[in-house]
Structure formats: structure tokens, C-alpha cells
Amino acid sequence: MAIKPKYIKQLGNVLLERYPDSFNTDFETNKDSVTTLTTVESKGVRNRIAGYVTQKKAQAAQKA
């Protein structure tokens, strides 16, 4: 698994901190949330952010 770039992690963490209820463990809904909450125009960057957020939510759910 590749290491995510710093800007993906930073933006993903900011989104999780500000809007924790907008995200869950489903990639498709997280993709829509990233689209509505940010101004990211690139589909690839949007998907990477959504994937990172999905991964973080899944890890948090496993620990709980």
C-alpha cells in the first residue's frame, strides 16, 4: 500500500476534525461528502481524500 501525500492527509484530517458526522466507512458517501465540503476539482485527488477518510473511519471503528 502506497503512502499518501502530505496534502491528502492534512486535508483529510481537517475534514474529519471539522465534520466528523459527515463521514462513515462507505467510500461512495465519503466521496460525495468531500465534493460538497471542499473545492477540490480533480477527481483523482477527491477520491484519494475520500479513501483516506474511509480508511481512518474504518480504523476507528475497529478500535471501538
Curated annotation (Swiss-Prot):
Family: Belongs to the eukaryotic ribosomal protein eS17 family.
Entry-linked PANTHER family: 40S RIBOSOMAL PROTEIN S17
Keyword Ribonucleoprotein found: yes
Keywords attached to this entry: Ribonucleoprotein, Ribosomal protein
Gene source species: Halorubrum lacusprofundi (strain ATCC 49239 / DSM 5036 / JCM 8891 / ACAM 34)
Example of a GO MF term: structural constituent of ribosome
GO annotation, cellular component aspect: ribonucleoprotein complex; ribosome
Protein name (Swiss-Prot/TrEMBL): Small ribosomal subunit protein eS17
Single GO biological process annotation from the record: translation
InterPro entries (alphabetical): Ribosomal_eS17, Ribosomal_eS17_sf
Pfam families, A to Z: Ribosomal_S17e (PF00833)
